[in-house]
């Protein structure tokens, strides 16, 4: 073996390398045992309802804890290595930064939208979180956690965070001008969340878009249209528009007209209107608060019957089924009363020619007698 290698691979160094590899191997093996037994033990201790939140904390830090165990084994293995003594200060900083990153990972998991934490906070403080507020708060908390983690890691490597913040203060005006649209979209999102004109899954209509709300972010809101297209609208634009939320209807209106022939006897028409009102009052799908069935107009060639009522359901498919059932019953009632539907048409009166000529002759005689 060359002399320059012999100074590295001495008996003591080989023993230290063996110890380092053994430490790393033990920690790799214990990582599986740690995951299998340690977390099972924690789960068994947290089966009671009062410790449900602790169980969620364990779930959030499951994977970060596994990697921490591996990182700890790697750090100890490097520490016993005979070749990296001079690099240990830098390695220690990297190790501490890795711990901060793993802690950040676990906290981000803990603040996920589906986390039990949001449910408990919502119950404890009665915040009335909906499907929009929870994702928004989740993203906001994650941003704060990541920003703090980056700041701690930067300070670990002696980076002057205060100077960076001061630099942002000096360039704040330029940043505000450059990010004017982003800031307006952010505050537009806050307005939407606080006023709650809609929530995830609602069908809304604005001057810009009509569709189902899929998600709201710091910058924009995404909609799924009836054609299946995904439309993204900036929050600043959405917060300044009139928003119609069709999902929040308590009942759905049905209004239409029926044309009845002038040949229909008036008695039959009166009985038909009375029967139609009774039918709507007794229909289980119709709201009884407002029911209007009226003969309201004399048209050119028909009587006009006006209908206005509301269905109890706001679901579009159920509303169509109720409308179809009512239409069939209208046909039955009008048919039973002998009422005929009017068709678009025009009456043309034709006079015979000889009658017109006789009228003209008589008119000429009268004019001569007067003369």
Curated annotation (Swiss-Prot):
Chain ranges passing through the membrane: 9-29, 58-78, 98-118, 133-153, 159-179, 183-203, 330-350
GO biological process: transmembrane transport
Subcellular localization, as worded in the UniProt entry: Cell membrane
Outcome of gene disruption: Cells lacking this gene grow normally in minimal medium or in high-osmolarity environments, and exhibit the same survival capacity as the wild-type strain upon a drastic osmotic downshift. They sporulate and germinate normally.
Function: May play a role in resistance to osmotic downshock.
Membrane topology designation: Multi-pass membrane protein
Family as reported in the entry's similarity comment: Belongs to the MscS (TC 1.A.23) family.
Name recorded for this polypeptide: Uncharacterized MscS family protein YhdY
InterPro entries xrefs: LSM_dom_sf (IPR010920), MS_channel_1st (IPR049142), MS_channel_C (IPR049278), MscS_beta-dom_sf (IPR023408), MscS_channel_2nd (IPR006685), MscS_channel_C_sf (IPR011066), MscS_channel_CS (IPR006686), MscS_channel_TM-2 (IPR011014)
GO cellular component: plasma membrane
Keywords associated with the record: Cell membrane, Membrane, Transmembrane, Transmembrane helix
């Amino acid at each position: 073996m060359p002399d320059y290698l012999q100074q590295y691979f001495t008996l003591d160094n080989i023993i230290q390398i063996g110890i380092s590899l053994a430490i790393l191997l033990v920690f790799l093996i214990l990582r599986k045992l740690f995951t299998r037994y340690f977390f099972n033990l924690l789960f068994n201790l947290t089966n009671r309802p009062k410790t449900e939140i602790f169980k969620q904390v364990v779930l959030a830090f499951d994977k970060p804890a596994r990697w921490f165990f591996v990182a700890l084994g790697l750090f100890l293995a490097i520490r016993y290595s005979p070749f990296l003594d001079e690099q240990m200060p830098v390695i220690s900083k990297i190790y501490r930064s890795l711990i901060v990153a793993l802690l950040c990972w676990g906290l981000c998991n803990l603040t996920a939208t589906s986390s039990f934490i949001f449910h408990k906070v919502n119950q404890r403080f009665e915040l009335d979180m909906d499907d929009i507020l929870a994702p928004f708060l989740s993203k906001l908390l994650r941003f704060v956690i990541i920003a703090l983690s980056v700041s701690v890691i930067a300070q670990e490597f002696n980076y002057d965070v205060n100077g960076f913040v001061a630099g942002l203060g000096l360039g704040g005006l330029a940043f505000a001008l450059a990010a004017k649209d982003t800031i307006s979209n952010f505050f537009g999102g806050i307005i939407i969340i606080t006023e709650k004109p809609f929530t995830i899954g609602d069908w809304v209509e604005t001057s810009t878009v009509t569709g189902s709300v899929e998600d709201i972010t710091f910058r924009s809101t995404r909609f799924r249209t009836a054609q299946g297209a995904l439309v993204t609208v900036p929050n600043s634009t959405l917060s300044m528009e009139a928003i119609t939320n069709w999902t929040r209807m308590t009942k759905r209106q049905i209004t239409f007209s029926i044309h009845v022939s002038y040949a229909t006897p008036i008695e039959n028409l009166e009985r038909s209107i009375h029967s139609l009102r009774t039918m709507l009052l007794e229909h289980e799908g119709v709201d009884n608060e407002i029911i209007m069935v009226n003969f309201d107009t004399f048209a050119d060639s028909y009587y006009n019957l006006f209908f206005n009522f509301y269905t109890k359901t706001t679901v579009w498919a159920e509303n169509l089924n109720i409308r179809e059932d009512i239409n069939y019953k209208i046909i039955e009632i009008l048919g039973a009363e002998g009422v005929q539907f009017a068709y678009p048409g025009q009456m043309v009166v034709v006079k015979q020619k000889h009658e017109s000529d006789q009228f003209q002759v008589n008119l000429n005689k009268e004019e001569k007698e007067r003369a």
